[in-house]
Amino acid sequence: MTFKGFSKKDFKTMQIPGLEARMNGIQTDIQPKFRAVGEELTTYLSAKLGDEMFLHIARHQRRSVNPPESTWLAICHDKRGYKKHPHFQVGLFDNYLFIWLAFIYENEESAKIANRFLKEKKLLADLPDNFAISPDHTEEKTYPVHDGQLKATLERFRDVKKGEFLVGKIYLPDDSHLSPGKDFIKEAEMVLDELIPLYKASLQ
């Protein structure tokens, strides 16, 4: 498909009641956009990193009753799966779109990664002021990257078994960067460029 951007309808899809109905909306309206965006960004990251990257689209197969509050694509160096590894995400809650570098609870190197980020403070200090962090990919709550929550979030990621760390940028439904499609791709590439040094550091 030709990607024309994200619209307010995409966010409303994440408000559809019921598991089956919301999943139908996600599969029909959002996932084709994820595939189009993801293919472009996967190619971009592969070239930037000099390493083949692979696109994954969340399928929410473990859901049996409650509909997913968010949905996303992930880009990772592992073709078989992304959850154990540092990976990039583009996705939606019903009230914002996110572009993250994500370290979720399945990551087996959380202590090493957190300690590196805590020690090498410049890696995160250099991020733009309009970037954000999240301690939990299942929750909507985010914090500005430079508002004082960073150290506590990294320590929780290090010390708590289910701790997570996501860093990147969020966009409200009326943000002008979300469409047309070429503008969103350009914006996403700029965000990824800011996150690549963190990604590389996490793999060392």
UniProtKB/Swiss-Prot annotation:
It comes from the Bacteria. Pfam families: DUF1054. Transmembrane segments: none annotated. InterPro entries: UPF0637 (IPR009403), UPF0637_domain_sf (IPR053707). Gene3D superfamilies: Protein of unknown function DUF1054. SUPFAM superfamilies: YktB/PF0168-like (SSF142913). Belongs to the UPF0637 family. This is UPF0637 protein Lm4b_01081. It comes from Listeria monocytogenes serotype 4b (strain CLIP80459). The lineage of its organism: Bacteria, Bacillati, Bacillota, Bacilli, Bacillales.
